[in-house]
Structure formats: structure tokens, C-alpha cells
Amino acid sequence: MLSVKSIPAFNDNYIWLIHNNDNHCVVVDPGDATPVLECIKEHDFILDAILITHHHHDHIGGVPELVRQFPSVNVVGPENEPIPTLTHPVGDGDFVELFDEQFMVLGVPGHTNGHVAYVGDEKLFCGDALFSAGCGRLFEGTAEQMFNSLQKMAALPDETEVYCAHEYTASNLAFALAVEPDNDYLLRYREKVLHLRAHGKSTIPSTLQREKLINPFLRTSEANVKKSVASKVQDSTEVEIFTALRRWKDEF
């Protein structure tokens, strides 16, 4: 099994550093090079690759400096997005070998048109597509694209760990409880999250099993979720339910 370290950046970003027992590492979505370089120096890591999920600056801002410091580093990212110094463009269904583990690339458009996620070693690095108890805003893609992307990720094994790129869990849970105020699991989990955050601790990684219990955007087939948006939809297809939820969340 590979190990993962979180490197906090900006106000609420997480840069993920994946490493093995030989001190080789990969970083995911390095929006800022400084904390990454500090972590690499502290642990005497060797940077092999950078994985990028999408082109937003808080996910790629540190790439040029990391490439300057490590000229031979592989930069892996979505083939149809403007990523600086990209060496390995990838798309849905491609594989990336990291530390003798095969990571599969999932095309998960919605937040951006070319957004990808990486899954391997029972870990999902999903950028701004899936959050704990939430999902990314639709800056470029359509609601139907995002719905399908979330369904694709939800089809992975329940034990898959979810490494999203932002600490949004507490605010997302507030919305989830507006959707499902009688969801006992949600109520209990919110207390745990508030305790963790009060002590400065991360709520990430989550798991897909947990997300299926707390994330309204993965619960569009649930009667209580459908009921919560019944007045906002023309019909009750899951895509329409998702679209109504996403609009509601944008205004929440």
C-alpha cells in the first residue's frame, strides 16, 4: 500500500503527496510549490511525477517551479486543458504507472470540460469533481456531464478512499442537512466533522461508502432527496434531481 500525506495550501486546498517506502513521491494538484518543496526537503523525498486533475490556477500554480527544481519530473494531466509543461497528456481509460501500481484515469467533466481523476491502490484523487458531501461547481461543463462523472466515481468499490482537493466538508454538510434534515447518519457525522475542524484536523480522506450516505449529489435516487426538490423540477429523472440540487447549492 502507498502512503499519502496532505499538504495544506491557500485557505482550504489540499495538495496530496503519494509516496512509497523508497522515498519516491508524486504530488497531486500542486497549486503552490513552496509547501511541496518544504515537505520534500523535510522527508528527503525524490519527486517522480506531478498529477494534475484540471487547469485551475490553485491546482497548477506550483508546477513551473517544481519543474524548474526537478527538470526530469513527469507532468501528467488532462489532454484537452491548458496545463504548463505537460509531458504526459492523458484521457479517460488511460493508465499511469506509479510505484509499480497502475492508476486508471477517469474522465470526469463538469467542473471543467477536461477534468480527470486518478484511481489506484484503493485511492481516488478527484480534484474538484467530487467533494466530501458535495461536488464541484459547473464552471465549464453541463449538469448532465457532472451527474455522469459522479456516477462513474460512485461505481468504484465502496472502500475506495476519496482524496478531494478542498476542505469543504463542514459547509457541504450544512447543505446536505437542508436537503435531508432527518438523515440520522448525516446528523451524527456532522458532529464528528465539527469536532475535527474545531481541533484543526482534516476530514479528508473520506470513503465512497460514507459519501453514498452523506452526499446529496450521490443520493439522487433516494426518496427524501427527490422530495426535497420536488417543487423545483419538471420531472423526477435523476439528472433533473441533480440539476436542481446543484442550482440550490449554488444559491445556498
From Swiss-Prot:
It comes from Aliivibrio fischeri (strain MJ11) (Vibrio fischeri). It comes from the Bacteria. Keywords: Hydrolase, Metal-binding, Zinc. The keyword Transcription regulation does not apply. This is Hydroxyacylglutathione hydrolase. Binds 2 Zn(2+) ions per subunit. Monomer. Thiolesterase that catalyzes the hydrolysis of S-D-lactoyl-glutathione to form glutathione and D-lactic acid.
